[in-house]
């Protein structure tokens, strides 16, 4: 496969976005709470990328994502990867992060927070209805 990353263009193209249920086996649900707990342990940061001319960037740290997924009990093989990269003339293996593969965590966390908001919004109504029903006539 041709390397989908072109450093000079900063473009990532992933030709393997197939998501048909017929291609998936051994499905395991990741709960909304697991998603929320994972995101709680991730800190967006700004940083300088020395290998790209000290360009100031916003992003995540692959090591933190890896640790947060493990802490939440989520086992995946396709979020954190590795790539040989050359920095200051020396080649080494560095961790990579597939940002788009974090989207399911965002969806799960939004579902969790949405359920909490609904519970909080319905709580005052329940109290008002309960208080009205308990007043003497």
Residue map of PLM features:
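Trimeric beta-solenoid/beta-helix "fiber body" segments of extracellular/virion adhesins
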Residues: 1-19, 41
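Intramolecular chaperone/auto-protease modules of tailspike-like proteins
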Residues: 17-137
